């Protein structure tokens, strides 16, 4: 695990964007394509807007990039809270990404079927025995959740690399998420976290004793890949080391 701490949100985003470009181009050179699982939320939105801006959009052959979603809210794709819709507006439309390169969760299906079908689509994409994304982008919630791996949910104990539906009792809503074992098979995993509101969660996940029920992001530990954190000084404020 490597922790990269920067002075500001702007520096965090710029450095993660540069990292994204490097990983993407290396994968394209080696295999002819780049597979990335996107994260939802306000922080990743700023990253996607940066990647599709004039300073970055010419640095990757975007027609060789295949986009997936590490988690999704169980809402229509036209809903304002949809991770797909956010990525569509911030990334896909500005970069003119074709539908053949966008692998979204079909939220028109029943929730368990949506999760199952997404797992099947991912398995078909990866012809090798092991499902191994080139890059999985993750955020971190104030409650130490990542993707839709929330505290005290049964999916935390899944041991199979797959996609599952999760019911969040406090929100009375479903989400669909990669399991931790699926995330952990990736070649590269990157957390994007900034702001003092995330400082406690960063400390819990990185430095506290293992307690996945309360700090689910502790589950993220790539088995044969690289884990990097991109955080600002505010988010790192409670780290002891």
What are these regions (language model features)?
Residues 1-36:
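N-terminal glycine-/serine-/threonine-rich phosphate-binding loop
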Residues 32-55:
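Glycine-rich N-terminal segment of FAD-binding domains in flavoprotein oxidoreductases
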Residues 49-60, 85, 151-160:
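A glycine- and small-aliphatic-rich helix-loop capping segment at beta-alpha/alpha-beta transitions
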Residues 115-116, 147-152, 201-205, 241:
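A short secondary-structure junction signal
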Residues 187-241:
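ATP/nucleoside-binding phosphotransfer catalytic cores, i.e., glycine-rich phosphate-binding loops
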């Amino acid at each position: 695990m490597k922790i990269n701490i920067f002075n500001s949100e702007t520096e965090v985003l710029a450095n993660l964007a540069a990292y994204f470009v490097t990983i993407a181009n290396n994968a394209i050179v080696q295999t002819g394509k780049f597979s990335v699982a996107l994260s939802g939320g306000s922080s990743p939105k700023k990253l996607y807007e940066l990647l599709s801006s004039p300073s970055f959009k010419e640095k990757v052959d975007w027609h060789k990039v295949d986009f997936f979603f590490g988690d999704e809210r169980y809402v229509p794709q036209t809903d304002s809270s949809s991770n797909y819709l956010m990525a569509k507006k911030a990334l896909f439309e500005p970069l003119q990404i074709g539908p053949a390169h966008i692998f979204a969760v079909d939220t028109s299906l029943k929730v368990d079927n949506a999760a199952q079908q997404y797992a099947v689509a991912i398995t078909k994409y990866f012809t090798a025995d092991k499902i191994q994304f080139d890059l999985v982008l993750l955020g971190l919630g104030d409650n130490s959740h990542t993707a839709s791996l929330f505290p005290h949910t049964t999916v935390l104990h899944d041991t199979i690399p797959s996609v599952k539906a999760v019911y969040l009792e406090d929100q009375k809503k479903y989400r669909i998420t990669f399991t931790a074992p699926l995330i952990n098979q990736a070649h590269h995993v990157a957390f994007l976290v900034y702001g003092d509101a995330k400082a406690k969660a960063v400390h819990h996940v990185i430095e506290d004793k293992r307690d996945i029920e309360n700090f689910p992001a502790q589950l993220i530990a790539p088995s044969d890949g690289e884990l990097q954190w991109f955080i600002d000084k505010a988010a790192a404020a409670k780290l002891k080391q």
